[in-house]
Amino acid sequence: MRVMAPLESSYQSTRLDANRQQTLNLFPNTLRGYRQFPGHVTFASFQSAGEALTDTNASAVTDSDGDPVQVSINPGGADRGLIADGPNGLLYQVTGSALYSIDSSGNALFIGEISNTPNPVVMAADATQLIITTGGTPDVYVYTVAAGLVVVTDDDLLTTSSVAFLDSRFIYQQPDGYFVVSALNDGATIATLDFAQAEALPDDLVRVFSLNQLLYLFGETTTEIWFTSGTGRPPLSRQAVLQQGICGTYAVDSIDATARVSAYSLHQENFVDFIFSDQGQIWCYHVTSQTWFEKDFMTTSIVHHYDLVLAAHSANKKIYRLDFANYQQDGANMTRRKDLPLISSEVMDVGGAEMVIDKIKLHVDA
């Protein structure tokens, strides 16, 4: 009996249409098998909910028909960004025009409103400050437990759409290839002299990003790497230049220190999601096997926090925990599909000879 392992990567055959090579919600896990992508179990919800509006006497306020007037207590919207380990060690999400903190039990607290919805935000945080950049007007907010949510109004900070945190300072993307560094431990204070320019090549600055104590300045065609040198204004120096850039502000993420991109680890498996929200598609790269598969549950932000992997849905105002003990998507059955490779005489090592296949046996663990 000839054993054919169905582990060949999909989307590579030139003899089949791409839509006949689909791998959906499955990824290679063992030498001869695939594993189901985990289910999505609700962790926190920002779906509109209502409670009766009451007057000063605790009596229900009614409309002209005598029905109680309801007020929204959990506003939410499209996922715009999710960040772990913000002030007080909490999880924070911008959902629609609302900023929420979420504790380890999934309880959410409304903090304030963020402009420029539904565009994604870029956030950075230390133990006491959460900085949110919108690319709109206002373009920068700072949240602290003591002072709440306020707009950053420093005249030395021009319009920005991304921020990073490095060595007790916040670094902001600026127009014309510039970036600016905040005061030590104060993301809302900018000094006039603390500007620098990514100037190795003339491509514009698309994103600032920190990783492994280095600052990455991503342009359209190049990337500059800077480090904290402690000298000069700002106290950073360029270390290297890479001849690759990125396609957009939200197309960068990291896995284990290494379109819109979200990267994450799950049960020692590494994944990178390439997200196309408008088309309702996610192409996922499984780093371990170096193969691709598709996902059909539209999550756009994924973080590790509270010893969980948490994913925010693109539109339904919920955050989910990924759970290998549950193979449903928000309570609905998950469709899984694996198109087998083309069975040909070449695969069976019989050249161009005619074949008759009497029996095919598949092993499926339900």
Regions of interest found by a model, annotated:
Residues 122-152, 172:
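Hydrophobic or amphipathic alpha-helical targeting/insertion segments
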Residues 98, 139-141, 222, 318:
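A short loop-to-beta-strand structural motif that recurs across blades of beta-propeller domains
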Residues 51, 57, 66-78, 105-119, ...:
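Beta-propeller and closely related beta-pinwheel folds
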Residues 96, 135, 175, 220, ...:
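Short loop/turn segments immediately following the C-termini of beta-strands
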